[in-house]
Amino acid sequence: VPRTLPALSRAAKLSKRAARVGFDWPDSKGVIAKIREELAEVEEALDAGDQQHAQEEVGDLLFAVTNLARTLNADPEQCLRTTNAKFERRFRYVEGELSAAQRPLTEASLDEMEAHWQAAKAEEKQSTHS
């Protein structure tokens, strides 16, 4: 697997290669269990104050999530691109609402921003079901 690939694409190819020879979970539930395990290891490293170990565990978590995408026949790059676009849309909504209220983002509370975020989600959901 070429080392020049973006990390997420390379992880997908590495996991696909391993799966082809049987080094894999029987189904997506096994991968989800692995994701939970890796997330717990991130938390343990953070609780121990070990930033370097936490970063290593985040890498393991990302790799496990890439495996989940593979078991769902999803392209992890496309999944992330879609989520990036969704995040950007919603964050622009938050910015727009605060701007309309003449409220600088830097002065808005997290609760206030979260309320606008949830409104953006609700608006998206309503427009997709219309």
Question: PLM features: what roles do these ranges have?
Answer:
Residues 1-58, 62-130:
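Flexible "arm" and connector segments at domain edges
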